[in-house]
Amino acid sequence: MNFEGVRILVVGDVMLDRYVSGQVRRISPEAPVPVVSVDKTWSVPGGAANVARNLARLGVETSLTGLVGEDETARDLEQAVEREGVCGVFVASPDRRTTRKTRILSQGQQLLRQDEEEIRPPSPEEMDALRQKIAALLPGQDAVILSDYDKGTLRRSVDGTSLCGHVLREAGHLGIPVLADPKGADWERYAGAQCVTPNSAEFAAACGRDPHVLLESGERESLAAQLRARHRFGRILLTRGARGMALFGEDTPWYCRATAREVADVSGAGDTVIAVLAACVGRGLDWNDSAR
């Protein structure tokens, strides 16, 4: 499918994913841990920036905004998104640390992950700066994605204001659909979104259910209807891992079975789902066809 001419804005928690790959040939004499002889290191956009990366690789004209620090990780992230053809317009703060996740790999398997991050909501000054960036980027977009990794950008500010609510209102005035990849229990901040794309654990948590207990289809559909009514969602696209996906809207629920594949690292699967869905919606497909 050709997405040339489609324009999408991604707003959310940007981060840098760093990878360290090598061989394990011995155990450390200092502690019972493997010693990795490093062969290669590389960095790619992560979090909301990975959503933008997916969109750009589909051929979508992609813009991205979020909070970063004034640090080396932010500079590396800016270069990484630029290499991907994404227009990154960040709000940098000297009091904030840019999120970086480092994954240690050997033979395609992840041995360890190291997170460097500072999780807090935007200050009033950061919120104002984000609103200004969004005001400049929003006109002419075909869709907006709220990519929430619960790192702070989309949390309510210390004065109670919500960036999600601002984006939803401004996009609504322009007739631009908003899709949200939710985190946490406060789904009210996404109220009015045309679509939310939780995984099974996120869906269960939002419904007050045990995420480790598999829901029956009838119960799942009832809970989805309650969430849609409570938060005025147009629809919910539930990603269910190896069990596929389910789309809940005004029509009969639609289920899609997954094709089984062996995957060593499943990180970023939800990013791909919302990127493809938004690209299809931005191109003009209806929601059912976009989900397919």
Predicted regions and their residues:
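Flexible glycine/proline-rich, aromatic-decorated loop/lid segments
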Residues: 26-30, 193-201, 243-270, 274
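Conserved N-terminal subdomain of the carbohydrate kinase-like
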Residues: 5-8, 16-146
